[in-house]
Regions:
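Cys/His-rich metal-chelating microdomains
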Residues: 54-60, 93-97
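Short pre-active-site segment immediately N-terminal to redox-active cysteine/selenocysteine motifs
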Residues: 50, 87-90
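Short Cys/His-centered divalent metal-binding micro-motifs
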Residues: 89-106
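Short helix-coil boundary/hinge micro-motifs
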Residues: 1-2
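Short, charged surface segments at domain edges that flank catalytic/cofactor-binding sites
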Residues: 7-57, 81, 112-121
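Glycine-rich loops and low-complexity Gly/Arg-rich segments
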Residues: 76-78, 93-97, 114-117
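Divalent metal-coordination and catalytic microenvironments
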Residues: 43, 72, 91, 95
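Histidine-centered nuclease catalytic patch
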Residues: 57-87, 108
């Protein structure tokens, strides 16, 4: 595993930790934004099985469906709408990059342009 000058792994996932101990189990309470399943369904239909950022096909799931992830371009937590004008279907790589990547702002800007064009059709 590649280690940087601070002693951290160069590679991370959503569960990254600097400690090498087994995780402890604990109960978590919180709030979640309610999402409209009709928006998700319409966005996935619009994408027709292709990432709306890179146009690559989603992968096939065990039950034969095409997998993409729906992404709120302007997050709900930042007053973004749960509407097809603000939601894109992305491959898992670009969905994670849109949240955690160095290019997240560029991806957001490109997705906003793409969604605007699709609304004009």
């Amino acid at each position: 595993m590649a280690i940087d000058s601070r002693g951290y792994s160069r590679y991370v996932d959503q569960f990254v930790t600097t400690e090498m101990q087994p995780p402890e189990r604990h109960e978590v309470h919180g709030n979640a934004w309610e999402r409209n399943h009709r928006v998700r369904d319409a966005v996935l239909k619009r994408a027709a099985g292709q990432c709306e950022y890179c146009n690559s096909p989603g992968f096939k799931t065990l039950d034969g469906r095409i997998y993409l992830e729906t992404h709120h371009v302007i997050p709900l937590s930042k007053s973004g709408a749960d509407h097809i004008k603000n939601v894109a279907a992305l491959c898992p790589n670009h969905h994670r990059e849109a949240h955690h990547g160095e290019q997240s702002k560029a991806i957001r800007d490109e997705l906003l342009k793409m969604l605007e064009k699709k609304q004009q059709r």
